[in-house]
Amino acid sequence: SLSDKDKAAVKAIWNKISKSADVIGADAMGRMLVVYPQTKTYFSHWSDLSPNSAPVKNHGKTVMTGVALAVSNIDDMTTGLKALSEKHAFQLRVDPSNFKILSHCILVVIAMMYPKDFTPEAHVSMDKFFCGLSLALAEKYR
């Protein structure tokens, strides 16, 4: 679980990167679809799955809106992300292992865009945060 120090670190990093959230999300989505091509099955209804396509960029923005929601509910992500968990479990039927894949891609992009801020300590806190976020999204699968 996240310590108070982790929560403070996540909030500090989010405060710094949130202005670029759309770019981070778009890049992370594009990377996920290229590096983990099996994830494309969830987006087969999109006309263009290339990294810079409009659907990929738009979904990246949507994903980062969810990350913002998780940051704002950092003390209880399971409750705060309940509706998103239900949507992904019952409507979209996304395999919850994909949450970890996309989380990793987001961490990679943050590290590339903010190398001075993404210290080893920040990395640990953000990784723990995304593990918690993934777990919260997987809650309705049980």
Curated annotation (Swiss-Prot):
Protein keywords: Acetylation, Heme, Iron, Metal-binding, Oxygen transport, Transport
Annotated positions of the N-acetylserine modification: 1
CDD domains per record: Hb-alpha-like
Binding site for heme b: 59, 88
Stored Gene3D superfamilies: Globins (1.10.490.10)
InterPro entries, alphabetized: Globin, Globin-like_sf, Globin/Proto, Hemoglobin_a-typ, Hemoglobin_oxygen_transport, Hemoglobin_pi
Domain of life of the native organism: Eukaryota
Tagged with keyword Transcription: no
Record keyword Disulfide bond present: no
GO cellular component entries: blood microparticle; haptoglobin-hemoglobin complex; hemoglobin complex
Tissue occurrence: Red blood cells.
A GO BP entry: hydrogen peroxide catabolic process
Role: Involved in oxygen transport from gills to the various peripheral tissues.
Subunit organization: Heterotetramer of two alpha chains and two beta chains.
Protein family membership: Belongs to the globin family.
Name the UniProt record assigns to this protein: Hemoglobin subunit alpha
Organism (species): Lycodes reticulatus
Gene this protein is translated from: hba
